[in-house]
């Protein structure tokens, strides 16, 4: 997988097949080689990058098998793009068995030129017992090993039923094989019964236990209603027969659900049927023709949602989109609550900042990944200092509107902490300009922060509600200096700030009072303090950070052949990475180190630390200053 854009676990990526590149997220429409009312060639205009067809159907039909063996599956279905073939697993589940074994099915898929082959795995359902699921995992793993040397791109399905630990085990087993494409199987019954909250558990326990370099496919997840949730959790591909199945039942797919033809009075403007029929004319069409036309509508709805999701990833607004989608159906809201329960786990994959503003909608927004990150930092901020803490109401200190009276009369004359309200929690006042604290667009429905919650970190006797008082003593510290130190603690690791910004650094501010530059003995430490409130380091600043931080913190270790170019300002590519700090946050400043342990450049990580070690294609770190550039 080559990653192009990302927003947390959601990504726009691409991978190559013998018949072309597939760009994700996307849907592979299911093609029945016996009945192709909409040809794969026609599907291209809807945004189709690849299709999936069933090798078992082809194998058991003499005419189809002979044609596929002679001319290939691409010729059989009339499509020159990437073709994935399924193995007959679902048919085995429905009918009890199939007449071909795993090796025969895989060899046949190779023979007919499939781009992505699928093993004959063991299907399990949500009602399968734990023992049945364990047996299925073991047998599926054995079958994968049986064809491990088959060559090409092989799909190794992840099973595990509704048991998160078994999903994890299956994912780890499949990841250890030559399977380079990982579908999540056994989920269709959950999708059909709208049990989306269980799918959240299944997807995350699969996704987070395999390599980020492998595509993740949600087998059977063909309705757009759940696409955004699945992509948010790391799914790259879906397959869909629903566009045809629903059409045969006179049902129209919309991005937020399904509607019966008998109950609609308008054809939406985005539908390919809008200028072609009235609703009355559509209802009066012969059944077979009507099904074909409704299939076109359904296909358009599916890919319209995929297009919107891709745009949201590019905008880095998937959090907002998920919050909006959650209110479209009670089952999605239940799934959203489940996603929020994973916020602490997902936080490490969340960017340091985003292009899009942070939207606060309601109480659910208090469970966001950024809230989890800031709560964790605030706890460290309080427990490490353990001193008098002033708390503010929204009317006394809003992010970006510093309470200068407090700074002058109290903060700079004491060693106190200061906490301001944001999204229903209290955060350090020194972080007021950092993302997402200042970059929040709020509904105004934030709950008042529970001040008693911070009593877990400090004594309740040390908490003060600011009421305009003043301390009668001399100035003993600078708010600006403490601000940049706290930002450094948040951005680079707690405790770094004081070592990085010594007492004698010079701070330069804009006419509006914003900190814009920091110098150490005439050397610029930060190239800029951006609108997101975080630091972009110069190479001199990176050198100081390298000296005051412990390896492997914030470091990416690269081959010397790459380091030579990185020192000149060229980006780091994934394929040259030897190792990386697993705790690196996407978009944070990253120290590029050669095989000798020498700092050669500083740049911005494009992905998280775990991802840095697992992708093989694309840009890993965008360099903004190399050692050789600094020396000029």
From Swiss-Prot:
Entry's Gene Ontology molecular function annotations: pentosyltransferase activity; RNA binding; zinc ion binding
UniProt cofactor(s): Zn(2+)
Biological pathway: tRNA modification; archaeosine-tRNA biosynthesis
PUA domain boundaries: 553-628
GO cellular component: cytoplasm
SMART domains named in the record: PUA (SM00359)
Residues holding substrate: 121, 186
Top-level taxon of origin: Archaea
Reaction(s) this enzyme catalyzes, per UniProt: guanosine(15) in tRNA + 7-cyano-7-deazaguanine = 7-cyano-7-carbaguanosine(15) in tRNA + guanine
Top enzyme category: transferase
Name of this protein: tRNA-guanine(15) transglycosylase
Record PROSITE patterns: PUA
Keywords: Glycosyltransferase, Metal-binding, Transferase, tRNA processing, Zinc
Family statement drawn from the similarity comment of this UniProt entry: Belongs to the archaeosine tRNA-ribosyltransferase family.
InterPro entries on file: ArchSynthase1/Queuine_TRR, PUA, PUA-like_sf, PUA_sf, TGT-like_sf, TGT_C2, TGT_C2_sf, TgtA
Record's cofactor remark: Binds 1 zinc ion per subunit.
Gene3D superfamilies per record: ArcTGT, C2 domain, PUA domain, Queuine tRNA-ribosyltransferase-like
CDD domains: PUA_archaeosine_TGT (cd21149)
Organism of provenance: Thermoplasma volcanium (strain ATCC 51530 / DSM 4299 / JCM 9571 / NBRC 15438 / GSS1)
């Amino acid at each position: 997988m080559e990653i192009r854009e990302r927003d947390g676990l959601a990504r726009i990526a691409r991978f190559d097949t013998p018949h072309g590149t597939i760009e994700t997220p996307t849907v592979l429409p299911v093609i029945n080689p016996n009945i192709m009312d909409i040809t794969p060639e026609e599907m291209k205009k809807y945004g189709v990058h690849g299709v999936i067809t069933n090798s078992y159907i082809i194998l058991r039909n003499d005419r189809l098998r002979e044609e596929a063996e002679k001319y290939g599956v691409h010729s059989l279905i009339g499509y020159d793009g990437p073709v994935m073939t399924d193995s007959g697993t679902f048919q085995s589940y429905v009918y009890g068995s199939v007449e071909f074994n795993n090796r025969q099915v895989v060899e046949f898929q190779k023979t007919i030129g499939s781009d992505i082959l699928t093993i004959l795995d063991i299907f399990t359902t949500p009602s399968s017992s734990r023992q049945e699921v364990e047996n299925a995992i073991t047998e599926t793993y054995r079958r994968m090993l049986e064809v491990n040397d088959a060559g090409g791109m092989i799909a190794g399905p992840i099973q595990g039923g509704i048991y998160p630990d078994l999903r994890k085990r299956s994912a780890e087993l499949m990841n250890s094989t030559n399977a380079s494409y990982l579908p999540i199987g056994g989920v269709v019954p959950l999708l059909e019964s709208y049990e989306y909250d269980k799918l959240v558990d299944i997807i995350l326990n699969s996704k987070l236990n395999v390599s980020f370099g492998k595509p993740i496919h949600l087998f059977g997840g063909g309705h757009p209603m759940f696409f955004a949730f699945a992509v948010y959790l790391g799914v790259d591909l879906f397959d869909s027969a629903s566009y045809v199945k629903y059409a045969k039942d006179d049902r129209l797919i919309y991005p937020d659900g399904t509607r019966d033809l008998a109950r609609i009075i308008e054809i939406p403007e985005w539908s390919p049927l809008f200028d072609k029929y009235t609703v009355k004319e559509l209802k009066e069409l012969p059944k077979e023709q009507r099904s074909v036309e409704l299939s076109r509508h359904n296909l358009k709805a599916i890919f319209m949602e995929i297009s919107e999701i891709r745009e949201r990833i590019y905008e880095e607004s998937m959090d907002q989109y998920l919050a909006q989608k959650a209110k479209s159906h009670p089952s999605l809201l239940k799934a959203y609550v489940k996603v929020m329960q994973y916020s602490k786990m997902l936080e490490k994959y969340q960017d340091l900042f985003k292009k899009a503003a942070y939207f606060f909608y309601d109480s659910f927004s208090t469970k966001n990944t950024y809230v989890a990150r800031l709560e964790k930092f605030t706890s460290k901020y309080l427990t490490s200092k353990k001193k008098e803490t002033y708390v503010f109401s929204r009317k006394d200190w809003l992010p970006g509107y510093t309470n200068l009276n407090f700074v002058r009369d109290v903060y700079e004359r004491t060693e106190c902490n200061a906490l301001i309200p944001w999204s229903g929690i209290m955060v350090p006042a020194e972080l007021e300009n950092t993302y997402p604290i200042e970059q929040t667009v709020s509904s105004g429905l934030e709950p008042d922060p529970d001040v008693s919650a911070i009593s877990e970190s400090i004594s309740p006797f040390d908490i003060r509600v600011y009421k305009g008082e003043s301390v009668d003593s001399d100035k003993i510290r600078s708010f600006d200096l403490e601000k940049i130190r706290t930002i450094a603690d948040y951005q680079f690791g707690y405790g770094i700030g004081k070592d990085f910004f010594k007492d004698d650094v010079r701070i330069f501010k804009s006419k509006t009072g914003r900190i814009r530059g920091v110098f150490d003995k005439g050397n610029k430490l930060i190239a800029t303090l951006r609108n997101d409130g975080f630091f972009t380091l110069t190479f001199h600043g990176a050198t100081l950070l390298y000296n005051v931080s412990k390896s492997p913190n914030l470091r990416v270790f690269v081959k010397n052949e790459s380091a030579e170019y990185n020192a000149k300002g060229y980006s780091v590519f994934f394929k040259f990475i030897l190792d990386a700090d697993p705790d690196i946050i996407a978009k944070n400043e990253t120290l590029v180190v050669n095989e000798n342990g020498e700092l050669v450049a500083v740049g911005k990580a494009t992905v998280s630390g775990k991802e840095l070690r697992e992708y093989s294609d694309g840009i890993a770190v965008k360099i903004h200053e190399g050692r050789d550039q600094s020396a000029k």
